[in-house]
């Protein structure tokens, strides 16, 4: 019985599981259905073990509960959990469940999905009401629900088109033979293919062409292997192998890929809107030696006439890598503040990195954290320690009730606008959480000493070059101080928390905190974690949070919880401004708080190519549209050609940043003439399209409809596009077809059966569902085509403008690409670009028909902006100067 299970000791459970695990999984008895209660919008039932327990990877839980709810006509919620509700469930505080409208499935409306089940053994199926297509079917494979292992398998059509299940660096369309997607967030240097990376998104899209597209989301944060393969009978399947938690499924009816993404956003949350300036170009590097080198980069971009919106600083600014500190010799506060002021005076911005790990030594962030008791502790009450950049470290417990105040206070102190580093946005890293020390890491202090943590800072430069354009008080002062000796700070000995109780002794009584007695370090089932043991390179999974939850269950939530609290801390600093926070680690729903950069990639053509698929997965499936890769690659030495190509591609990432690693060749865009030219051209196009991007981005934050689109999202009935992940739509109007091979000046681009226009010439190209070879593509160019039927608003004066502030002052030109019927339409959204709450805006639709351009919509923002020109694409490109104010409805004849 489940109640009896809670009274057994860990040793007894382990011995029992191993003694009884004689049966293969295929012989597990499954469950039978009893006590079914039909409801207007679903049903409830009890599931009871249908035979002898098999106890293969834990102890079978005898009594389960089944609930189904037709939340809306397009969404079905199916939940299977233990009857006693002691098994861990993702807390509502971390993932708020959608509010279900009682009228969403009124009697006159018919749900688009159907739930059916078999009683003994229990299985269930989900089908599409309109065509009886079976979408999910567990028949023939018994449900296994054990203390540390949950298994559920669904059959699939042959050769299915599956997408999602991130984070990974595999093709967008998932492999379907002998393929395993492991979800266990880890520090994944070089983002190797076929492995678990920084995020966990148990959401997939199943695209079946004209039969429709649906989505399946499993709300479960435990480690898992999701296996896709064929069985011995050649039946295609997808199988969940989970280390715990419950089966909390949301099924989305679609029927289009865009519909599925919108429906997922209704559950996971709408993405956060970013400030307009955040869509500009960003520069960073790990390894800038001092604040003067950072300033020199700013100057060099200006000299090269490459627009730079935001300058970043990696952990180099810290005192021996300790968060919320400055290196007083290399990044003195007054000089950092002077640079920030210099940037702000020129409408540029500044960002630094913050890691979660706090140095276990005498420093303010550590001392204040101790006072509030916010750090993770072991079961004996002592502080849990790992080893990260500053050496021995402790980790904030995001579940602790004091942590929010602690984190907000640290930001308020260090990033104080009047006395600290007045950052404009935030970068958070290492929040899987990363830990350099392998389990069991019994002596993190010794590990840090042996592995040179923190690393020696660079020697203080005695004679940094003067900085043209900077004021005299900012210029370097000559110094012969070459003292870079390590400050070995005193390790503070902390007693166990007084009165601390081993969490896990009282986690019954339906509190959903996780079963007692589990093997939290070495569970019987081994997921394919590329780091090895669950606790390798991260926090130990047998430690507990202040609310009683085990790290074993919540590991995949750590980065997203840091994201949420960091966004709150940024809001506290600037309550009326939209925060921009970029994170490495994510879980489902993280897009409501943050954007994501795709991690520590490599300067290779393989990583360049796969960055497109990664970007599309996050933006179109996982609802994290502020996404992009490190342009030119993070680790390894880039090349001039690769960096040129990447500069042009990255300009069509929503998040556009150049970043690379200490010790590698410098790769700022001005380092090579050809790369500088590529960057200037690409940024000019990007900035001309910035309001088009901003409009599309805003729409996703309001409706959930994605704007960065795989081709199958735009042409769902074209079977030729299901595997294309080297082309994409930038908004629904612009097709981007980058060169993806080294040494090539051509690209084999697929054009669906539609009308397209070359962005550069305006000439038409009639797609016929075939591959067309585009030739003579220089290293500084990227092929772009506008889809027929679209109007694209572009800023008229973007060329040569250094900041997005300048861009916002220029007027508009409408690029009109008539469809096959001769008509076209497009949208434009303008607000103040930064306020959290907008009270005034221009939100309009442009239409073109029979030679007339019209505008209508919302005009509550007082503005002098106007449409100054139009360009009508076609065999004979037409350009006209017009005057169409954006202060009210109107139109002009061309």
From Swiss-Prot:
GO cellular component: extracellular region
Segment forming the signal sequence: 1-21
Residues bearing carbohydrate: 137, 178, 300, 402, 482-483, 536, 601, 637, 802
Subcellular location: Secreted
Catalytic residues, chain numbering: 429, 432, 600
InterPro entries cross-referenced by the UniProt entry: Gal_mutarotase_sf_dom, Glyco_hydro_31_C, Glyco_hydro_31_N_dom, Glyco_hydro_31_TIM, Glyco_hydro_b, Glycoside_hydrolase_SF
Keywords (A to Z) from UniProt: Carbohydrate metabolism, Cell wall biogenesis/degradation, Glycoprotein, Glycosidase, Hydrolase, Polysaccharide degradation, Secreted, Signal
Gene3D superfamilies for the chain: Glycosidases (3.20.20.80), glycosyl hydrolase (family 31) (2.60.40.1760), Golgi alpha-mannosidase II (2.60.40.1180)
Catalytic activity, reaction form: Hydrolysis of terminal, non-reducing (1->4)-linked alpha-D-glucose residues with release of alpha-D-glucose; Hydrolysis of terminal, non-reducing beta-D-glucosyl residues with release of beta-D-glucose
Major location category of this protein: secreted
Any Gene Ontology biological process: cell wall organization
Known EC number: 3.2.1.20, 3.2.1.21
GO molecular function: alpha-1,4-glucosidase activity; beta-glucosidase activity; carbohydrate binding; glucosidase activity; hydrolase activity, hydrolyzing O-glycosyl compounds
Described function: Glucosidase involved in the degradation of cellulosic biomass. Has both alpha- and beta-glucosidase activity.
Family: Belongs to the glycosyl hydrolase 31 family.
Protein name (database record): Alpha/beta-glucosidase agdC
UniProt source species: Emericella nidulans (strain FGSC A4 / ATCC 38163 / CBS 112.46 / NRRL 194 / M139) (Aspergillus nidulans)
The organism's taxonomic lineage, starting at the top: Eukaryota, Fungi, Dikarya, Ascomycota, Pezizomycotina
Gene encoding the protein: agdC
